[in-house]
Amino acid sequence: SRKGFVYDLKSFSLESSFEYGSEGWGITTMGDYLVMSDGTNKLYHIAPSTFNILREVEVYDNVGPINQLNELEYVGGLIWANVWLTDRIVAIDPKSGAVKYDLDLSGLLSAAERGKLDDKDDVLNGIAWNPVSKTFYLTGKRWPKLFEIKVEIPN
């Protein structure tokens, strides 16, 4: 709908709404601003008070652009994004757009569980960070399970 909403943090009552010019697939906070994906290979650094785009960063790995960036989390100085219609999560340098780590999560669901899903869009689609346990929660569209994983980053 290209429309955003501002809610009161305590009462959750709607305070205002605003329009913006792109699709919003995923969003995360990074310091004093937001980072949003729109299903392309771009990440948009956004001022939260105005929703104006401050900067665009193109995301790429050693093969080329990474399109269909979806849900985002900012953890450990990197932006973690699931790549829609795949079993991948990529960890992105927010300044350069370079993929630093690429997680293959194709083994999360068993063959039997996968067989009950629609191959077209019942895919990995949710990523959330738990700062207490330092783990990610992962799930997908119509998946029967929620997974908690710990990612060990090499020094």
Where are the regions that the model predicts?
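Loop/turn-rich, solvent-exposed surfaces of beta-rich toroidal or solenoidal domains
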Residues: 65-98
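Beta-rich, blade/repeat-based domains predominating
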Residues: 20-40, 63-75, 111-131
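A short beta-strand motif characteristic of beta-propeller blades
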Residues: 12-18, 55-64, 101-103, 109-117
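Short loop/turn segments that connect beta-strands within beta-propeller blades
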Residues: 8-12, 47-51, 93-97, 150-154
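Blade-level signature of beta-propeller repeat domains, shared across WD40, Kelch, NHL, RCC1
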Residues: 128-155
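Conserved beta-strand positions in repeat-built beta-propeller and related beta-rich domains
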Residues: 1, 34-40, 81-85, 138-141
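Glycine/small-residue-rich loop that forms an oxyanion/phosphate-binding "nest" at active or ligand-binding sites
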Residues: 1-20
